[in-house]
């Protein structure tokens, strides 16, 4: 089965094409600035030269059309025709409590995704545009929606409910949903394989640390708690998101600074986090570089980030009555030995002990010292492959 994976944003569209017989990546690409000036497609076929096509791309229909044309081109294509594309898998951010698993796209599932626009106004509408564009450009090709929230639907009620008036919270579906579920699920499965143990026997804490960051407690294969909440704003300090904060600070700031609801939302989502603390950047590489030069605010931002991660690890170890493995993934988790060291220092009571030399390496690795009872691992995430796997799983029958 040849599966096209689509991650559709409001003005961009990422794609990857997989041959699921071997789980082989055939090509990947990015369509940028949809509906804006300077739009382009960057196509990267495996084993061939990269191709950049600069052209007017008014909407997602045109973006998908260009994607299919690139994949089937006689020079830089990787399949002979669009008829070879057997299925399309879409990343959809929010499945609410409607979807506890990925779902084949049909009239009902599409209506249910649209019904969640109110709780995911930035992410779900572009996903639907991508789905509809594929329906237009690849008629008859089955599609699957894979939800960032679905993996977390196993979280128990005492962990996902907020202590608001019960009827009010239920009326507005106001609860913890969690995100990055596809990534957390993938790296947990891979870590179990690396350890040579069944996932169902393990207590794993997965740390997806990038510009967006979240932590999940996975008890014997099931998500039992996660740091992001009703939206991706809750939990860890992030590149530009504030993370956990006293909610009373919101009306206080609105009153003192004369901010609207939109402005305070923008402040907490786009101007806070390590960017807000450092005043320098949301990119952790920049912060590490500046901190090494003596920038105290950059160091403070890094220390605050590491402390929050460590605090969640301790909490989730308590939730699961221990932990067998801690997994680092995503941009910062995979590529920053110093951040992994900062997070893991002081966790010896959990059986955590890093091997300093292994921690300096790159790529997939068990970076624990010999004899450590809690394994610390680095696993590069691959959300696109996980989406392709779910698409294949639901359609192969």
UniProtKB/Swiss-Prot annotation:
<protein>
    <recommendedName>
        <fullName>Acetate kinase</fullName>
        <ecNumber>2.7.2.1</ecNumber>
    </recommendedName>
</protein>
<feature type="site" description="Transition state stabilizer">
    <location>
        <position position="241"/>
    </location>
</feature>
<comment type="similarity">
    <text>Belongs to the acetokinase family.</text>
</comment>
<keyword id="KW-0418">Kinase</keyword>
<dbReference type="GO" id="GO:0005524">
    <property type="term" value="F:ATP binding"/>
</dbReference>
<feature type="binding site">
    <location>
        <position position="383"/>
    </location>
    <ligand>
        <name>Mg(2+)</name>
    </ligand>
</feature>
<keyword id="KW-0460">Magnesium</keyword>
<dbReference type="InterPro" id="IPR043129">
    <property type="entry name" value="ATPase_NBD"/>
</dbReference>
<dbReference type="GO" id="GO:0006085">
    <property type="term" value="P:acetyl-CoA biosynthetic process"/>
</dbReference>
<dbReference type="InterPro" id="IPR004372">
    <property type="entry name" value="Ac/propionate_kinase"/>
</dbReference>
<dbReference type="GO" id="GO:0005737">
    <property type="term" value="C:cytoplasm"/>
</dbReference>
<feature type="active site" description="Proton donor/acceptor">
    <location>
        <position position="148"/>
    </location>
</feature>
<dbReference type="Pfam" id="PF00871">
    <property type="entry name" value="Acetate_kinase"/>
</dbReference>
<comment type="subunit">
    <text>Homodimer.</text>
</comment>
<dbReference type="GO" id="GO:0008776">
    <property type="term" value="F:acetate kinase activity"/>
</dbReference>
<feature type="site" description="Transition state stabilizer">
    <location>
        <position position="180"/>
    </location>
</feature>
<feature type="binding site">
    <location>
        <begin position="331"/>
        <end position="335"/>
    </location>
    <ligand>
        <name>ATP</name>
    </ligand>
</feature>
<dbReference type="InterPro" id="IPR023865">
    <property type="entry name" value="Aliphatic_acid_kinase_CS"/>
</dbReference>
<keyword id="KW-0963">Cytoplasm</keyword>
<keyword id="KW-0808">Transferase</keyword>
<comment type="pathway">
    <text>Metabolic intermediate biosynthesis; acetyl-CoA biosynthesis; acetyl-CoA from acetate: step 1/2.</text>
</comment>
<feature type="binding site">
    <location>
        <begin position="283"/>
        <end position="285"/>
    </location>
    <ligand>
        <name>ATP</name>
    </ligand>
</feature>
<feature type="binding site">
    <location>
        <begin position="208"/>
        <end position="212"/>
    </location>
    <ligand>
        <name>ATP</name>
    </ligand>
</feature>
<feature type="binding site">
    <location>
        <position position="91"/>
    </location>
    <ligand>
        <name>substrate</name>
    </ligand>
</feature>
<feature type="binding site">
    <location>
        <position position="14"/>
    </location>
    <ligand>
        <name>ATP</name>
    </ligand>
</feature>
<keyword id="KW-0479">Metal-binding</keyword>
<keyword id="KW-0067">ATP-binding</keyword>
<dbReference type="InterPro" id="IPR000890">
    <property type="entry name" value="Aliphatic_acid_kin_short-chain"/>
</dbReference>
<keyword id="KW-0547">Nucleotide-binding</keyword>
<dbReference type="GO" id="GO:0006083">
    <property type="term" value="P:acetate metabolic process"/>
</dbReference>
<comment type="function">
    <text>Catalyzes the formation of acetyl phosphate from acetate and ATP. Can also catalyze the reverse reaction.</text>
</comment>
<feature type="binding site">
    <location>
        <position position="7"/>
    </location>
    <ligand>
        <name>Mg(2+)</name>
    </ligand>
</feature>
<dbReference type="GO" id="GO:0000287">
    <property type="term" value="F:magnesium ion binding"/>
</dbReference>
């Amino acid at each position: 089965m040849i599966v096209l994976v689509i991650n559709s944003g409001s003005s961009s569209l990422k794609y990857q094409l997989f041959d699921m017989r071997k789980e082989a990546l055939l090509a990947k690409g990015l369509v940028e600035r949809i509906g804006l000036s300077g739009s382009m497609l960057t196509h990267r076929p495996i084993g061939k030269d990269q191709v950049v096509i600069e052209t007017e791309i008014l909407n997602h229909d045109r973006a998908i059309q260009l994607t299919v044309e690139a994949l089937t081109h006689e020079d830089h294509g990787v399949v002979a025709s669009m008829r070879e594309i057997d299925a399309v898998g879409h990343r959809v951010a929010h499945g609410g409590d409607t979807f506890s698993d990925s779902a084949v796209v049909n009239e009902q599932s599409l209506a249910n995704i649209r019904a969640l626009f109110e709780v995911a106004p930035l992410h779900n509408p572009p996903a639907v545009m991508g789905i509809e564009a594929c329906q237009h450009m690849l008629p008859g090709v089955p599609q699957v929606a894979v939800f960032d929230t679905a993996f977390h639907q196993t979280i128990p009620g005492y962990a996902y409910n907020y202590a608001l008036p019960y009827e009010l919270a239920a009326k507005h579906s106001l609860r913890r949903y969690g995100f990055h579920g596809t990534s957390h699920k993938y790296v947990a499965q891979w870590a179990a394989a690396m350890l040579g143990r069944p996932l169902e026997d393990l207590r794993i804490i997965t740390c997806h640390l990038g510009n967006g960051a979240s932590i999940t407690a996975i008890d014997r294969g099931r998500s039992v708690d996660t740091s992001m909440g009703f939206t991706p704003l809750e939990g860890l300090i992030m590149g530009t998101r504030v993370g956990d904060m006293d909610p009373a600070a919101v009306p206080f700031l609105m009153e003192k600074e004369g901010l609207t609801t939109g402005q305070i939302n923008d402040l907490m989502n786009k101007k806070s986090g390590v960017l807000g603390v450092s005043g320098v950047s949301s990119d952790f590489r920049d912060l590490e570089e500046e901190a090494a030069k003596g920038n105290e605010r950059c160091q403070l931002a890094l220390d605050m980030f590491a402390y929050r991660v460590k605090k969640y690890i301790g909490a989730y170890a308590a939730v699961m009555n221990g932990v067998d493995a801690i997994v680092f993934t995503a941009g910062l988790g995979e590529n920053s030995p110093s951040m992994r060291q900062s997070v893991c220092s002081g966790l010896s009571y959990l059986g955590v002990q890093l091997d300093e030399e292994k921690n300096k390496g790159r790529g997939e690795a068990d970076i624990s010292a010999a004899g450590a009872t809690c394994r610390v691992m680095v696993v590069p995430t691959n959300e696109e492959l996980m989406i392709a796997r779910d698409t294949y799983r639901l359609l192969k029958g």
